[in-house]
Amino acid sequence: MQCPYCQHTNSRVLESRSSEGGQSIRRRRECLCCKHRFTTYERIEFVPITVIKHDGKKESFDPSKLLRGMVRACEKTGISYQKLETIVDDIEAQLQQRTQREVTSQEIGQLVLKYLRQENEVAYIRFASVYGRFQGIKDFVDTLKQLQEEDLVPSETIWKPANDDFSEQETPSTVMMPS
């Protein structure tokens, strides 16, 4: 490791520990030439995830953009900002574990809805109304009816917007359409 003070390439590791919840390694080093001490971090380099939007455009996955959308949906619901950050981190981890580097915005929306459904029904409805591009009150009523039915029959069911075009591959195995 190159010393930031004298640019010498030899250093010794004084201390090494896990950091950032096991996501990186923090190393305390000492330059063998100038004796200055410095800290380095070793992190996993993730391959970027590309999001395919509704209109077909592609953009890099931005966790902060997802978090902002969730914060808006969860205002005044009692879900803490830290909980939303944890959900976004979980979603990002799930996406990183996939072999495919492209994901549709619909798939991301489904993941968010799955988490919000467990946390708060109001947040779920708010997010679904934007994600599903609700056109009117009928869309809200249909989604509320679906929530009531799911409460009677517990399942892993996820709401699917009526105007969405999932291919067979992309459709979660237990998707319900609003009636």
From Swiss-Prot:
Zinc finger (unnamed): 3-34
Keyword Transport attributed: no
Record field: compositional bias (Polar residues): 169-179
Start and end residues of each ATP-cone domain: 49-139
Annotated stretches, region: Disordered: 160-179
Cofactor(s) this protein requires: Zn(2+)
Matches recorded under InterPro entries: ATP-cone_dom, NrdR-like_N, RNR_NrdR-like
A molecular-function term among this protein's GO annotations: zinc ion binding
Domain of life: Bacteria
Keywords (A to Z) from UniProt: ATP-binding, DNA-binding, Metal-binding, Nucleotide-binding, Repressor, Transcription, Transcription regulation, Zinc, Zinc-finger
One BP term from GO: negative regulation of DNA-templated transcription
Cofactor, how bound (note): Binds 1 zinc ion.
KW Metal-binding (keyword) present: yes
Family listed: Belongs to the NrdR family.
General function of this protein: Negatively regulates transcription of bacterial ribonucleotide reductase nrd genes and operons by binding to NrdR-boxes.
PANTHER family according to UniProt: TRANSCRIPTIONAL REPRESSOR NRDR
Protein name: Transcriptional repressor NrdR
Organism: Rippkaea orientalis (strain PCC 8801 / RF-1)
